[in-house]
Amino acid sequence: MDLTGEQSRLINKFVQDWSIDERLELETTFGVRGVVDSNTFLQIAQRLRTKGYQEIPQEDRLNIITPNNIRFTLQGLGILQEYCNDDTLDNKIFTAMFKDRAFPDSNIDIHEYNIRFKMRREEELSRTDPRIQELLKTWNTQRKAFRLIRRWSFEGKGIRMDLSMVRQTTNVPGKGEYQWSSTFLERSVLSEIPRYEVEVELLHHTPFTDTPDKALKTLISGVGEIQRAIQKNTLLI
């Protein structure tokens, strides 16, 4: 995989910043607008299993996203079914997170390969956080987008690959934002055509990512593994 000097410089800068701030998430997505086709998705899963990556079981999850970049996550089929029926977080276990771009230029697009490196800042929020409490008070009228996710995760040395089949709220045509709704059923998420998404995420606090140089090698190695599966080739083209 050939990169320009500027692309290499920017990726190096991402890794340097990621290495000194554990709130930062550095990941890579694949395909046009972050989506691959189902055959490519299966090719990637098969390669990761063949190469001995550790498969990590995942429960189905529902991400509920608000316009102010707060994401609620429910996990487990039973809880998801309950939410679909009652549209409330009352008496349900959930996690919450504030997630946004780390800085204005937080995407690096490698158009020749349909790859995007992206940096995001994450902040876990407790149920008692004032921002969460305010949202819960007016939950019935809050604008929301929904992502119903079935995920297969594979972990390697300092890296995790997430392969996700996603049904989600559609975007406004010609824009990058969701068609917000106040209830799950309002946008018929269950009837949406699934999207197939593949992400490579660099993991903090591992012996393979504890210096910027090691983290960069780990990231490029993981991206290369996915690219080989996409290209159906043992050598990167």
Protein language model regions, located:
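Phosphate-end processing signature that detects enzymes handling 5′-triphosphorylated RNA
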Residues: M1-I237
